[in-house]
């Protein structure tokens, strides 16, 4: 055993003092002091439970003692009579055994592979013991779940990730998926429940038993987000539902996750065999699957983006050459060849790497290097986490913890340990880069760049610039020169370091070579400089633009076309990662894919880290808006599709925000008890305005109204129980908070809830009955106009049907036409007086006469006027399809409907493009004359009055 360095000797003295103050001070041996000095977790536990130290002396930890964990746990649970006692027993058992594992790990009486086995078996034993105990309790309370033949049904649990691979780290989440074989009902209970309800309740109680923080801590953080549909999906699925999902909707990333999936408990009963056989074809293809290469390239890029996004430094898991890359290398062979090579279907990494060597897929020396690096990194990770039982993979920067890790890894000091670590990670990186065969970065020097070096490195006169920009006017050339000079001056005032300066000197001539030949070179460069100033001290992004010429060209193209995009990139440089794949950049996601893509994005963020979750939501929105804007700028997306994509994106984010708020509220208060007998969450969100009408723009806010379905006497079922309706009020407040909180990536959306019943004076959340009553008896005509553009964007099928029925009933009421005309007209005049342009030489596309708002009012008036006789007019909430319906049902001529639609789309298109230019909706007074004349004619026809025509 190495002598303790000075930092640990000081720590040892402090520990001796603390143990000497115990009622019966133990006799500490040298090895005891070494472990206690290395791990605050172990020393804290043994101070609370000094008898565990005596046990360590009497029964020292053995490498193979994991075989007895289940037996020991059964003894610990033998006297447990209720759930509170179960939670206490599980937590104490976990702490006791984790102390033993940390002890043998530090003293190296167990190897790293054995430590991983111990940690994984401990988790599995506790999951299964808790499941079995709770299953019996649930059967007594609710009856036994049976299939249609009366055969009892079990809960099967898939351990994912490192748990599934038997490679759990010291302080880790556990990723689980719950399943049961067949649908049916409970038997022997007071009333029948279907199996889905039974297993959902069992699953919820199991998660609580493992995950809930008590005075004794917790057992494991449980992450259920890998299940089908993630947080928005059922907690437990039948085999049939699982099979349908993976056959019809399983994504590549879910296939990768399934490689390590393992049934907890090691059972080999028919149900377990059936589930394994069902999943195998999804994971391992029968043919050699080279189609996976591109997906793996995308994953490689995702790793790099993740490191940049989270600002990860010194991270031994996600950093270059880290644990994740070794796992990735191993999965490449499993996914490509695993269907035909059973030896590659191992879940554990080291045996799979050995099979890779035996099959000749990698040189033996590389496999040996990878295996050695993996064991080195996993031991380092476990020692790091054992310091305080914290889930971290970031190396410390304080001398004490650096000394702990260096000593624990067998090195004299931190410098020696760091050198060994660097060598291991470099060896991994070499294999990782070779294996995926990513496109070679374009780092060659274009000969033409030499012409532009002097433009960056020398102080030039205007006459010197003329040969490089012969097409520019003198004024534009002067502006270009001033921009370069100003940027050079700004850079000189910043600390960018020698590497940053070197990369910037490579980048600027390349950038000038692309920008200077452009006819708008002066404008383009002024926009690009804003971005460069934001990243000039962040060498990673400068390197990205140097190494990937295509990315540089995309930046120039987009920033030149849109100052909005330029300012977004300048504020949030992590969006530069989106430029690496031009195919996805100019092709936004399929409308149905936003929810799934966001779900994957959020999976990379700890579920309980609200700050990171908020950041991730905002970063996802910005990245997707950039892709939509790119499609808009290049005319790959017409105006209607731009709004469709912005609306689908908003709906996906609404869904995720509600999920996050719901999880937080349920963790605090439990869920309203009436939900145990009903589908859904008793909560709905109505989208009004541009969201409701599928007409969102780049900077649109969200008009939302919250509805609930909850009886009066309901309470939540958590330890801190509150009134059910109070729960929904706080849920809505939480949702508003998550949208509006300003992080380093800004806010998510501005949310306006003033269209709710009684406006700002009304309750933030209304019951569905109160909403219906208000619409019937108190709402103004303008509120019914707003209802034309309203639709449900979140809620159960029941609430969906209820809202649609209320909306149709209200819109189909008989209305006296003269009065309706007058009320619609008066509201429009009031808006125009308040919002319209007061300047004769300006036309406001939105607010002035003949503009978009007039078109919207015509559509709303026609629905309110004619829906009583033709209820099908209420089907759509967007203006274009409303006009189509008016023509279809012979209320408006096809020619007029088409003309209004053309005017509407043309003006909407201009507003989108003005937004990309960061300009308002005000244009010259002689704009859109033909469109405005058509709108004025239709306004006069339908809402006849002495309304001012378009001049």
Curated annotation (Swiss-Prot):
Record's keyword annotation contains Nucleotide-binding: yes
First-tier enzyme category under EC: transferase
What cofactor is this protein dependent on?
Mg(2+)
Membrane-crossing residue ranges in chain numbering: none
Q: Which InterPro entries match?
A: GlnE, GlnE_rpt_dom, NT_sf, PII_UdlTrfase/GS_AdlTrfase
Q: Where is this region: Adenylyl removase?
A: 1-440
User: Which keywords describe this protein according to UniProt?
Assistant: ATP-binding, Magnesium, Multifunctional enzyme, Nucleotide-binding, Nucleotidyltransferase, Transferase
Provide a GO CC annotation, any one: cytosol
Tell me which HAMAP family the record gives. Answer: GlnE
| NCBIfam families the record matches | PRK11072.1
| Main function | Involved in the regulation of glutamine synthetase GlnA, a key enzyme in the process to assimilate ammonia. When cellular nitrogen levels are high, the C-terminal adenylyl transferase (AT) inactivates GlnA by covalent transfer of an adenylyl group from ATP to specific tyrosine residue of GlnA, thus reducing its activity. Conversely, when nitrogen levels are low, the N-terminal adenylyl removase (AR) activates GlnA by removing the adenylyl group by phosphorolysis, increasing its activity.
Protein name per UniProt: Bifunctional glutamine synthetase adenylyltransferase/adenylyl-removing enzyme
Q: Which organism is it from?
A: Yersinia pestis
Upper taxonomic lineage: Bacteria, Pseudomonadati, Pseudomonadota, Gammaproteobacteria, Enterobacterales
Record gene name: glnE
């Amino acid at each position: 055993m190495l002598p303790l360095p000075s930092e640990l000797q000081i720590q040892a003295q402090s520990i001796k003092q603390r143990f000497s103050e115990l009622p019966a001070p133990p006799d500490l041996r040298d090895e005891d002091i070494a472990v206690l000095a290395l791990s605050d977790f172990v020393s804290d536990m043994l101070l609370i439970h000094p008898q565990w130290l005596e046990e360590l002396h009497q029964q020292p930890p053995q490498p193979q003692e994991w075989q007895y964990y289940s037996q020991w746990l059964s003894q610990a649970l033998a006297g447990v009579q209720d759930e509170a006692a179960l939670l206490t027993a599980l937590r104490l058992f976990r702490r006791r055994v984790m102390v033993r594992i940390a002890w043998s790990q530090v003293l190296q009486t167990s190897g790293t592979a054995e430590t991983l086995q111990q940690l994984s078996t401990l988790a599995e034993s506790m999951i299964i013991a808790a499941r079995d105990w709770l299953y019996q309790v649930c059967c007594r309370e609710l009856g036994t779940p049976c299939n249609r033949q009366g055969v009892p049904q079990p809960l099967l649990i898939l351990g994912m990730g490192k748990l599934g691979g038997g490679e759990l780290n010291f302080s880790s989440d556990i990723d689980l998926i719950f399943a049961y074989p067949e649908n049916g009902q409970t038997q022997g209970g007071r009333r029948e429940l279907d199996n889905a309800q039974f297993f959902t309740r069992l699953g919820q109680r199991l998660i609580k038993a493992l995950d809930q923080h008590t005075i004794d801590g917790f057992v494991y953080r449980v992450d259920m987000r890998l299940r089908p549909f993630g947080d928005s999906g059922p907690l437990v699925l039948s085999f049939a539902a699982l099979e349908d999902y993976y056959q019809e909707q399983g994504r590549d990333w879910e296939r990768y996750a399934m490689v390590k999936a393992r049934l907890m408990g090691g059972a080999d009963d028919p149900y377990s065999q059936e589930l394994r056989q069902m999943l195998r074809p999804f994971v391992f293809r029968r043919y050699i699957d080279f189609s996976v290469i591109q997906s793996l390239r995308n994953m490689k890029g995702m790793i790099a983006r993740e490191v940049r996004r989270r600002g990860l430094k010194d991270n031994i898991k996600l950093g270059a050459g880290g644990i994740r890359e070794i796992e990735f290398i191993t999965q490449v062979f499993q996914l490509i060849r695993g269907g035909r090579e059973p030896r590659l279907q191992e879940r554990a990494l080291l045996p799979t790497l050995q099979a890779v060597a035996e099959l000749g897929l990698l040189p033996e020396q590389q496999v040996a290097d990878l295996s050695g690096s993996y064991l080195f990194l996993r031991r380092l990770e476990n020692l790091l986490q054992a310091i305080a039982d914290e889930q971290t993979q970031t190396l410390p920067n304080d001398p004490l913890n650096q000394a702990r890790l260096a000593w624990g890894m067998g090195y004299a000091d931190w410098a020696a340990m760091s050198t060994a670590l660097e060598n291991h990670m470099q060896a991994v990186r070499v294999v990782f880069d070779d294996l995926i065969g990513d496109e070679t970065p374009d780092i060659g020097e274009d000969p033409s760049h030499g012409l532009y070096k002097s433009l960056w490195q020398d102080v030039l006169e205007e006459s010197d610039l003329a040969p490089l920009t012969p097409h520019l006017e003198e004024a534009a050339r002067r502006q270009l020169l001033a921009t370069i000079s100003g940027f050079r001056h700004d850079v000189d005032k910043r600390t960018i370091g020698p590497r940053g300066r070197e990369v910037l000197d490579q980048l600027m001539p390349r950038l000038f070579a692309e920008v200077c030949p452009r006819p708008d070179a002066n404008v383009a460069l002024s926009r690009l400089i804003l971005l460069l100033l934001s990243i000039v001290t962040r060498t990673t992004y400068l390197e990205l633009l140097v190494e990937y010429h295509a990315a540089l060209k995309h930046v120039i193209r987009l920033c030149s076309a849109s100052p909005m995009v330029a300012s977004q990139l300048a504020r949030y440089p992590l969006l530069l990662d989106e430029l690496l794949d031009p195919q996805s950049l100019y092709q936004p996601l399929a409308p149905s894919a936003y929810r799934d893509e966001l779900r994957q994005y959020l999976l990379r963020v700890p579920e309980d880290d609200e700050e990171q979750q908020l950041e991730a939501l905002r970063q996802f929105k910005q990245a997707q808006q950039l892709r939509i804007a790119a499609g808009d700028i290049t005319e790959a997306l017409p105006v209607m599709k731009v709004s469709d994509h912005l609306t689908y994106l908003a709906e996906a984010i609404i869904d995720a925000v509600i999920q996050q708020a719901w999880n937080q509220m349920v963790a605090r208060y439990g869920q309203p008890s009436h939900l145990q007998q009903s589908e859904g969450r008793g909560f709905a969100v109505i989208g009004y305005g541009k969201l409701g009408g599928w007409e969102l723009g780049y900077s649109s806010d969200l008009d939302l109204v919250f509805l609930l379905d909850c009886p009066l006497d309901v309470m939540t079922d958590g330890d801190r129980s509150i009134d059910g309706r109070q729960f929904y009020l706080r849920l809505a407040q939480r949702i508003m908070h998550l949208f509006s909180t300003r992080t380093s990536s800004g806010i998510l959306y501005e949310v306006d809830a003033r269209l709710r019943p009684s406006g700002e004076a009304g309750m933030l959340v209304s019951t569905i009955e109160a909403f219906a009553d208000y619409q019937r008896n108190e709402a103004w005509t303008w509120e019914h106009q707003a209802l034309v553009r309203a639709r449900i964007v979140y809620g159960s099928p029941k609430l969906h049907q209820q809202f649609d029925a209320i909306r149709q009933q209200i819109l189909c009421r008989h209305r006296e036409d003269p009065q309706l005309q007058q009320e619609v007209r008066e509201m429009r005049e009031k808006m125009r007086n308040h919002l319209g342009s007061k300047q004769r030489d300006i036309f406001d596309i939105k607010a002035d006469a003949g503009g978009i708002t007039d078109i919207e009012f015509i559509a709303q008036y026609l629905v309110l006027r004619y829906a009583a006789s033709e209820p099908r007019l209420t089907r759509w909430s967007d203006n274009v399809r409303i006009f189509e319906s008016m023509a279809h049902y012979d209320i408006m001529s096809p020619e007029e409907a088409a003309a209004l639609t053309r005017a509407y789309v043309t003006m909407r298109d201009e507003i989108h493009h003005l937004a990309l230019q960061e300009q308002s909706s005000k244009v010259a007074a002689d704009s859109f004359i033909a469109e405005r004349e058509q709108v004025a004619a239709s306004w006069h026809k339908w809402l006849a009055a002495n309304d001012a025509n378009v001049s």
